[in-house]
Structure formats: C-alpha cells, structure tokens
Amino acid sequence: MRTTYMAKPNEVERKWYVVDAEGQTLGRLASEVASILRGKHKPTYTPHVDTGDHVIIINAEKIHLTGNKLQDKIYYRHSGHPGGLKETRAADMRANKPEKMLELAIKGMLPKNTLGRKQGMKLHVYAGSEHKHQAQKPEVYELRG
C-alpha cells in the first residue's frame, strides 16, 4: 500500500516568479499569487509545510479595480487608541501606497497563522516596473485568463 507523499521543509525547491500587475484585476491577481505563495501549484503541496515560491509583483500602481470600487472601497486601520479609526479610499491608496493595496489583498487570502505569516514574507511588491531581485533570476509567470 502506498502512503501519501509529505514534503519536508529541507526538501522544498523554491523558485522566484515575476508577475506584471499592469491591467490585471486586483482580486483575480491576488488569488493566483496567494496560491503560488502557498505552493498549491506544485504536485508536492503539503498543507502543513511551506512549499510555496517567492513572487515579485511589478507595476502595482497600474492595478485595475472593477466597478466603482476605486471611489467606494474603503480601507480601515486602527491606531489602538480611542477614536483612532482611520480610513483610506482605494483611489488614495492606489495613488500613495499601491504596494500596500496588493499586500493587503494577498495576505488576506493566506492562512491566519504562523505558516501564513511565513508565506506572506515571500511576497515582494513594487509600484514601478523595476525590482531589486535580478540576482535570483526570476521567471516571468503568465497568469491564467
């Protein structure tokens, strides 16, 4: 009888991928990138082991939001002090911190535990078309759809 393959942390082969966010829809891009970060695109995927790859996202400032989300979507954060609730519209977020907008969308799709935090550290987002990871020889990842 065969047993199910379980990846071991020291056996995991990690690749680096570059994803161009220009013209891509925020949620559709985020769900594919989250899947790569978790390692679900590999046949060696194991739920309790970090089998994911590194993902570099460029052109985050050119991400697309459907409908009226650019004006209507609001990001909330709290300082921890009474009356410290802050809100930012999606249009302002895309203009000032486009990297943060993508990071929030992708990290929201990862597990809320230590493994998810570790997987989130393999995400590298840049507003422009330049990134500083040429030494890792990243491959261009073509998104489905």
From Swiss-Prot:
Domain of life: Bacteria
Keywords recorded for this protein, A-Z: Ribonucleoprotein, Ribosomal protein
One Pfam family matching this protein: Ribosomal_L13
The keyword Ribonucleoprotein is assigned to this record: yes
Gene Ontology terms, MF aspect: mRNA binding; structural constituent of ribosome
Disulfide bonds: none
Keyword presence, Transmembrane helix: no
Gene Ontology CC annotations of this record: cytosolic large ribosomal subunit
SUPFAM superfamilies: Ribosomal protein L13
GO biological process annotation, one example: negative regulation of translation
Listed Gene3D superfamilies: Ribosomal protein L13
Listed InterPro entries: Ribosomal_uL13, Ribosomal_uL13_bac-type, Ribosomal_uL13_CS, Ribosomal_uL13_sf
NCBIfam families given in the database record: rplM_bact (TIGR01066)
Function: This protein is one of the early assembly proteins of the 50S ribosomal subunit, although it is not seen to bind rRNA by itself. It is important during the early stages of 50S assembly.
Subunit and interaction comment: Part of the 50S ribosomal subunit.
Family the UniProt entry places it in: Belongs to the universal ribosomal protein uL13 family.
Protein name, per record: Large ribosomal subunit protein uL13
Organism listed in the record: Halalkalibacterium halodurans (strain ATCC BAA-125 / DSM 18197 / FERM 7344 / JCM 9153 / C-125)
